[in-house]
């Protein structure tokens, strides 16, 4: 049966089209408030688990978060389905639901000590991305689901690899060479998309090497600085890190260049605890930004759009102006899923997906989304602070900074807080390279959390054994 035939059959079942339209209107209007309330409760739980050590109580919170996620997913799908009566939406929903349930159950089954908060947030952000990308572009949704499913399956083994392979800190120079070669590859076979020559197209799929290299890059900096922070070693790692950044600047991928630079400074400061390095780095970065503004016309264009999007609305400022229109139109509660016009925003499903979310789901939902992203960062930092191995500690902190700074650049750009840098919102925006690298990031953090839990359990067992031996000797 074709789509039209299925729609006609559904209409016949419910009586007539007016009833469907009325049902849809009621559902859209009520659902946006229900979704906001549910997401607010989920967000509250993201922070409530940081207080107290009651494991049983926290497990109840995690299970409640899962129920909230599945409920929001169902409501959003119901609204989108009634909007078009396209049965394909139901098929995609079932596939998404199967993926979310499988990943949730599989990770907990394989890793008993897995951080349920990290897992829950990863799945919640993925789900929001599925809903919004499906609302904007069905073909892109299918691709996103394929990429997410594949990397979630592969990512299941990443914590296992981290647990059983303890030599990651020995290959600092190797990581640097691999990263530089991968970034430089675009000069040979790269393509220019959206003004930046940082894409490689293979079999119809476009990917950004910088998204994958940013993981290797953190391993490189952490491996080097975990061994020494003497001046000569800092100079060496700074030069190699600078090569990464300069290649990205040459490719006109300034958003990624900023992320790499800030990540390097963060790891350097934490490793050395030298405020002088941080001050010198920030001064050098500011000077480089001024130079980039005068050298690159596309940087000048973005700064102009940031300073006065309304005055350049027919040219450079069109994208930012449409983004602000969408956010303003949505207000606090949103237009309702499917009721806005996010397609008027250029690249709404990638760089500007936060604007589309704000328009249809409202500012309250968008603020909760920001808070969930922040809770991810806090959780990453908490995990890093508990880790005793210096390399893993620096790696976790570096990945945390990469994640939160990318969120800042994305949301700051679409809200006119800073000039747009062309980076995506992790796990939410469409993009195979982005979703793959971010899930890998979450899995690495998960692996380090699991490893640390096992080491703590082993230490406690050893301490209990030693205490028992001492008691026996006293007798």
Describe each region flagged by the PLM.
Residues 52-59:
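Extended repeat-based interaction scaffolds and adjacent low-complexity, acidic/S/T/P-biased segments
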Residues 74, 86-315, 355-415, 440, ...:
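Hydrophobic alpha-helical transmembrane segments of multi-pass inner membrane proteins, especially
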Residues 32-51:
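N-terminal signal-anchor/start-transfer transmembrane helix
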Residues 1-24:
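Short, strongly hydrophobic alpha-helical membrane anchors
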Residues 309-350, 354, 363-365:
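TM-adjacent membrane-interface loops and short helices in multi-pass inner/ER membrane proteins
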Residues 17-31, 81-92, 136-143:
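Membrane-helix interface and helix-disruption motif detector
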């Amino acid at each position: 049966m074709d789509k039209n035939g299925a729609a006609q059959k559904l209409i016949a079942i419910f009586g007539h089209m007016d009833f469907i339209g009325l049902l849809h209107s009621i559902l859209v209007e009520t659902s946006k408030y229900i979704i906001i309330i549910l997401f607010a409760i989920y967000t509250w739980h993201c922070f409530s688990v940081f207080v107290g050590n009651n494991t049983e109580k926290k497990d109840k919170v995690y299970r409640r978060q899962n129920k909230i996620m599945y409920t929001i997913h169902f409501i959003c799908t119901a609204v989108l389905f009634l909007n078009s009566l396209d049965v394909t939406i139901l098929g995609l929903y079932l596939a998404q639901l199967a993926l979310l349930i499988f990943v949730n159950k599989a990770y907990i089954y394989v890793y008993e000590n897995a951080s349920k908060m990290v897992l829950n947030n990863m799945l919640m952000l993925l789900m929001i991305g599925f809903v919004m990308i499906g609302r904007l572009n069905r073909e892109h949704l299918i691709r996103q689901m394929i990429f997410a499913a594949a990397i979630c399956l592969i990512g299941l083994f990443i914590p296992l690899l981290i647990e059983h392979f303890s030599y990651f800190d020995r290959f600092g120079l190797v990581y640097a060479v691999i990263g530089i070669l991968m970034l430089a590859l675009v000069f040979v076979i790269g393509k220019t998309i959206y003004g930046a020559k940082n894409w490689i197209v293979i079999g119809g799929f476009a990917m950004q090497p910088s998204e994958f290299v940013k993981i290797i890059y953190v391993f490189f900096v952490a491996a080097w600085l975990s061994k020494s922070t003497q001046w000569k070693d800092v100079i060496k790692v700074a030069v190699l890190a600078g090569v990464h950044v300069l290649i990205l600047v040459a490719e006109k991928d300034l958003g990624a260049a900023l992320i790499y630079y800030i990540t390097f400074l963060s790891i350097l400061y934490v490793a050395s605890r030298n405020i002088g390095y941080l001050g010198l780095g920030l001064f050098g970065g500011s000077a480089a930004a001024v130079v980039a503004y005068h050298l690159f016309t596309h940087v000048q264009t973005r700064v102009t759009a940031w300073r006065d999007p309304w005055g350049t609305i027919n040219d450079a400022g069109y994208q930012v102006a449409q983004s602000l229109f969408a956010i303003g139109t949505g207000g606090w509660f949103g237009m309702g899923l499917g009721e806005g016009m996010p397609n008027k925003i250029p690249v709404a499903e990638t760089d500007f997906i936060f604007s589309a979310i704000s328009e249809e789901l409202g500012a309250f939902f968008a603020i909760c989304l920001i808070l969930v992203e922040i809770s991810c960062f806090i959780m990453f930092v908490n995990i890093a602070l508990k880790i005793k191995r210096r390399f893993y500690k620096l790696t976790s902190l570096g990945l945390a900074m990469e994640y939160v700074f990318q969120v800042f650049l994305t949301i700051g750009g679409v809200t006119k807080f800073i000039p747009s840098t062309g980076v995506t919102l992790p796990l939410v925006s469409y993009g195979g390279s982005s979703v793959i690298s971010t899930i890998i990031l979450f899995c690495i953090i998960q692996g380090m959390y699991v490893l640390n839990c096992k080491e703590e359990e082993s230490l406690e067992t050893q301490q209990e054994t030693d205490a028992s031996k001492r008691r026996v000797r006293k007798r």
